[in-house]
Structure formats: C-alpha cells, structure tokens
Amino acid sequence: IKIVVERDPIKTSFEKWAKPGHFSKTLAKGPNTTTWIWNLHADAHDFDSHTNDLEEISRKVFSAHFGQLAIIFIWLSGMYFHGARFSNYEAWLGDPTHIKPSAQVVWPIVGQEILNGDVGGGFRGIQITSGFFQIWRASGITSELQLYCTAIGALIFAALMLFAGWFHYHKAAPKLAWFQDVESMLNHHLAGLLGLGSLSWAGHQIHVSLPINELLDAGVDPKEIPLPHEFILNRELLAQLYPSFAKGLTPFFTLNWSEYSEFLTFRGGLNPVTGGLWLTDTAHHHLAIAILFLIAGHMYRTNWSIGHNLKEILEAHKGPFTGEGHRGLYEILTTSWHAQLALNLAMLGSLTIVVAHHMYSMPPYPYLATDYGTQLSLFTHHMWIGGFLIVGAAAHAAIFMVRDYDPTTQYNNLLDRVLRHRDAIVSHLNWACIFLGFHSFGLYIHNDTMSALGRPKDMFSDTAIQLQPIFAQWIQNTHALAPSLTAPDATASTSLTWGGGDLVAVGAKVALLPIPLGTADFLVHHIHAFTIHVTVLILLKGVLFARSSRLIPDKVNLGFRFPCDGPGRGGTCQVSAWDHVFLGLFWMYNAISVVIFHFSWKMQSDVWGSISDQGVVTHITGGNFAQSSITINGWLRDFLWAQASQVIQSYGSSLSAYGLLFLGAHFVWAFSLMFLFSGRGYWQELIESIVWAHNKLKVAPAIQPRALSIVQGRAVGVAH
C-alpha cells in the first residue's frame, strides 16, 4: 500500500485569521491606499499567487471543496427547514392542482404583509417557484416531520464536511501523487459517486418513492400512507402494490428479469395523473445508469496490469493530419488545475444547458409541468448557470495559457497546432459572426419594413414567404415515430414535444403537447446562432491570444489581467485575457436573454394554457408567437411590453414585490453603466478635490483614497 498522505503538515491556528492579507508579503503590510481592500478580495482565493508549490495549492483547493459542500448542505438544510416550518407542503400534497406551493410568510412590518398572496387552502404566503415541493413528492416525502429530519441530517453532513476540510489540510493532507493518480480517481468517481450514487437513488425510488407515489396518485390521504421505513422493512406492503416483490431476488438470479417490469418500466411519455415522467421509468433509468457507471469504474489500470492507462491512450491518439496528436496533454492535465477545470466547466456548462431543456420537455417530477412559474424559473436558472460555467471555462483556459503553459514541452501536438493557426480560426469565426448577424437581423428588419408598409404578403412568415425549419421538423418527426421501431412496448415517445398528437393535461391545465416549429422559430434560432458564435469568438480569441499577439508579442509577461501595455503604447488597453472574459460575459448575457425570451413566449403562446371539457385548448397568449415574433416591433410590443406592463403596474397587490424587483434590477443595471462609461481619471480628480477639502479641515484619512483601477471598475460594472 502506498502511503499517500502527510501527517500533521500544518498546525491549526487562528492567528492568521487576525492578519488580513497574510498570504501575500505586500498585502500583509496593511493598507496604504484604498486599493488594498480590492486586492485583498481579488487575491484571497487565488492560491497560485500564494505559493508555487503545486502540492500545497492542490491541498488548499481540495480542502476548499469540502467547505463548499458544507455551505451547500447548510443551504439545502435551510430549504428543507422552510418546507417543514413555514410552508403549506402538506396541504399542497393533498391538492396539488388547486393549491400553490408556498414556503415563506412575510411578517407584518411596515405593511409588507401585502406580499402574502392567497395560494389556496386558506394559506397566505409568497408563492415559491423553486420546484422543491415537486422534488419532495417525487422522493416520497409525505409530512413536514420528514422534512425536519432531512434538514437536521443535512446539518450533520455539513458538520462532517467542515471536519473533512480541516482534517485533510491539517491532519492528513494528500501528497501530490494522490491528486495526480487519474486512473484511481476515475475508478472511484465513476463507480463510487456516479455508480453507487445512482444505485442508491434507484433503491430509494423503488423501495420508498414508487409505492408512496402510487398511493398518492390513487388519491390516498398522505396521513394514511405507511412511513418510508415500513415499506423497506415489510415486504408484504410492497407486494400488495407490485406482486413480483413477493418473489424477492429469485427472478434476478434466475435471469428472469422481466418479472420486475411492474416497477422497472419503459413506457415513455408522461403520467396523465401528475403530468410528470413515469417514476417507474426514472427508477429503471437510474438502475441502468448505475450499472453502466459501475462497469466504467472498473476500466482503468491501477494496482493490476489490466485496464486503460490515460497517458497511453492520449499518446496513442494520433490522426493522419494531427501531428503528434494528444502527446503532452496528459502532463498538462495532471499539473495544471486551470486546464483541468476549463475542460470540466465547459462540459458541465453544456450539460447544465441540456438539463434546462429537459426540465420542460421531459418534466421529471409530479405536477411540475403544470406549475408554469416554476417551469420558467427552472429553465432560466439552468440556462444562466450553464452560461456562467462556459464563460468560466474560457477564463480558466486563459489563466492556464498565461500561468501554466510551457511552449517548450508542447511541440506539434494538437494544442500547439491550434495555437499556430489561431489567425485562421479567429478570422473564420469572425466571418461566421458577421454573416449570421447581418442575415438573422436582416430577416427581422425586412419583416418590420414590410409590416410598416402594409405588405404582409412580402413578409417571411408561415402565411406568406415560408422559411420552415425543415431539419428541426425532420428530427422532431423521427423521434415521434422512433419508438414504434426501437421500443415497440413503449406507449409514447421520449418527449411529447416531438409530435404525434398526444396532449397531457392535469387539472384542466396543459402539462405538455407537441411543440410546433415554424418560420418564427427559424428566425429566432438564427439569432441564437449569432449570439452564441459571438460569445465563442470573444472567449476563444481571449484564450488563443492570451500569451502573445501581433500587437503585444510579450503579453504573457503582463499576466492574466492588465489595463494597458504601459505608457507610450496607445491602443493597447483592454487586450488582456481578463478583458476578453469581461466582454464574453456581456455576450453570454445577450445570448441567454434571447433564449429565455424565446422560451417564455413560445411556451405561453403554443404550449401552456387551459383546456375545456370539450378538449379545446386556450393558450395564455393565444398562439400569437408565430405571427408576432417575426418582427422586432412584435417582440417589443407583444412580448416585452405586454409581459412587463403587468409587473410595472403591480403596486398595491401581492405581486408588488416583483414590480419593485423589476424596478430595482433596472436600477442596478443603470448603476453598472456608471462604472463602465466613466473614465478612471475623472474619479481620481474628483477624489483629490475631496481629499484637499479634508486636508483643509484637518480630517484627512491615513489610508489614501484611490479611484478604482480600470480593471476593477469594469469588474464592478459587469457584476452589476
């Protein structure tokens, strides 16, 4: 056994906590000017700047992860505690179609109690849109007591995480070799976290969630349903609902697995009672995922001479046109955590955006699809998180290029080849952006002009000149028809959005129906393509030119963030890798705004709405998307103004909080422009006048005030 920890490397002491800036020689001296506090914040978690010792940096990052997990558990505990203490969860569980979820009651201070709207069932509070109630029901929570217990459990886990963070930094800190043992890490993460994690969740779903939800769907009072541990301990209870449970594990070991198809199903579509995915489908899914990951977690070579070796795989990975291929990348990914993080963020960010799209097209929890506010919030939330992670990927890729890239070890491999033809990449991408920008915007301008001239027959629309998204429609159609060939026992396709005419409504509200795509979607999809390509252009240019450019050949010496290349070199401001991340963030915001607008209007126009006894669907905005969203004027008038006016005029009602937030958000946005539009010199002059006045009155501060640096000002601006 290899000993891969060091015992008692750093003694535990609170002394450093009393010395702000202890991690930096310069900052530890204390403040001379007000810039000190900004540098303190900028560098406190920049472990690279504290030491060059990769082992020490790795330990700090590892330890910080436990701190992060502790915070997450505390936050989660708070959510569950609110559900237990301040919510109408039990009432909602009894009647989820008429009662809205609420877990916050505003205290009557200076009239704020106006925010407590009537959410049904005699409960007054703020309606929540986080989806927690739906998750709780799906996992089989039937009482507020269970929420209390889970909240306490989360706090215990938080304490464990805090202890682990301390222990693995101060008592038993891993050696560098442990952090670099990628095969062992892959085996443990794949088999342990993802494999056993999915397996335990599948077990919970089968033994606890499924029976409880089966009874809830049948209309049994939550108070009459047996408690979770009773289902686990008493097999008879489960056998009443799923007779094959009486046979135990015999069918498993005799390979007669179809016996289990009562609770491990492959139905497709949605449960008509709840409007969510069949929970028997999701249990089956998690079991299958668990098997895959448990196998994957045994594929990498560690102590025995079988299995994959990452270094060998990467070095063998050469194509006919790619030079040395992946040679040298193994060394990068085991010595630069920025490079590793960049890849992980890019993948996790993309995955998060995929999750955003699955939350509405395959709503995973009961009664989620008919809770429109929550659907909108979850989509927005996952799109934003995904956007931040992808921009973060570019940021850390650029930091890797500046701090960790060693050109002498990377010759003619893929990274080197990409860097050598970066001009071709960036100029082609730039051309793509110009093309997409002019053409997508041009289609709208054309429509606005024709509309203004009263020539509807000359517009691009479903009723005039059609630009149908034929490829998207083909994909939809293929997926709608696929199950009949690939899964003959399935009753529906993976998602109702593909087509096929099915409609699921719960409590006279539409849960989901086939989403039609037309000219309007074709137009806005090209705006999506445009904004995404511009974001990529800015971020990729920042990474590829992080070390050098024709303008500043020695850029790497200036670091990741710098305002300009010194005095006497005009036109070299705002070229640092940091500035590219800054600009990329703005375009990420642009891109996501259009996505959220598109989703919000499309769903209200073509999916969400009420259904009459005769089966007639009335959509929230009456299906106006196809004809209104094809002009810029239509977006402004029929979406932005039509939706915002209700919020703006909300004062005096329980919605007023949203009106104030709306106003406040625009105030914050305007505040950000103050930092972005004014120059540093302006503020420095102003400060010096004010300091002069203080000197006159002999109240001058010991710490000299200074204007924000250019980079700091832009950081404050983009944050707001």
Curated annotation (Swiss-Prot):
Bound cofactor: record note: P700 is a chlorophyll a/chlorophyll a' dimer, A0 is one or more chlorophyll a, A1 is one or both phylloquinones and FX is a shared 4Fe-4S iron-sulfur center.
Gene Ontology CC entries for this record: chloroplast thylakoid membrane; photosystem I
Pfam short name (any one): PsaA_PsaB
Membrane spanning stretches: 61-84, 147-170, 186-210, 282-300, 337-360, 376-402, 424-446, 522-540, 580-601, 655-677, 715-720
InterPro entries tied to this protein: PSI_PsaA, PSI_PsaA/B, PSI_PsaA/B_CS, PSI_PsaA/B_sf
Binding site for chlorophyll a': 666
Keywords noted in UniProt: 4Fe-4S, Chlorophyll, Chloroplast, Chromophore, Electron transport, Iron, Iron-sulfur, Magnesium, Membrane, Metal-binding, Oxidoreductase, Photosynthesis, Photosystem I, Plastid, Thylakoid, Transmembrane, Transmembrane helix, Transport
Residues the record lists as binding chlorophyll a: 674, 682
Top-rank taxon, per record: Eukaryota
UniProt GO BP: photosynthesis
Topology in the lipid bilayer: Multi-pass membrane protein
Sequence similarity: Belongs to the PsaA/PsaB family.
Function: PsaA and PsaB bind P700, the primary electron donor of photosystem I (PSI), as well as the electron acceptors A0, A1 and FX. PSI is a plastocyanin-ferredoxin oxidoreductase, converting photonic excitation into a charge separation, which transfers an electron from the donor P700 chlorophyll pair to the spectroscopically characterized acceptors A0, A1, FX, FA and FB in turn. Oxidized P700 is reduced on the lumenal side of the thylakoid membrane by plastocyanin.
Self-association state and partner proteins as the record states: The PsaA/B heterodimer binds the P700 chlorophyll special pair and subsequent electron acceptors. PSI consists of a core antenna complex that captures photons, and an electron transfer chain that converts photonic excitation into a charge separation. The eukaryotic PSI reaction center is composed of at least 11 subunits.
Name the UniProt record assigns to this protein: Photosystem I P700 chlorophyll a apoprotein A1
